[in-house]
Amino acid sequence: MLDIKLLDIIACPLCKGKLSYKKNSNELICKFDHLAYPVIDGIPALLKVKARTISSDEE
C-alpha cells in the first residue's frame, strides 16, 4: 500500500508528469507515457525497466 502523500512529491521519471495511484493493482499510472509503475512493499519502483505499458482503457 502506498502512502498517498507521496503523490504530491513524486513524478514520472520520463516525462516528469503527475502520477495517479491505482489501488486495485497497486501501481502508479502515467497517463501521458501510458506506463504503470509497480509499488512494491509500499515503495514505488519508478524505473522504466520495472514499468509495464498500459492501454488507454486501463488508465
Curated annotation (Swiss-Prot):
<comment type="similarity">
    <text>Belongs to the UPF0434 family.</text>
</comment>
<dbReference type="Pfam" id="PF03966">
    <property type="entry name" value="Trm112p"/>
</dbReference>
<protein>
    <recommendedName>
        <fullName>UPF0434 protein Ping_0902</fullName>
    </recommendedName>
</protein>
<dbReference type="GO" id="GO:0005829">
    <property type="term" value="C:cytosol"/>
</dbReference>
<dbReference type="InterPro" id="IPR005651">
    <property type="entry name" value="Trm112-like"/>
</dbReference>
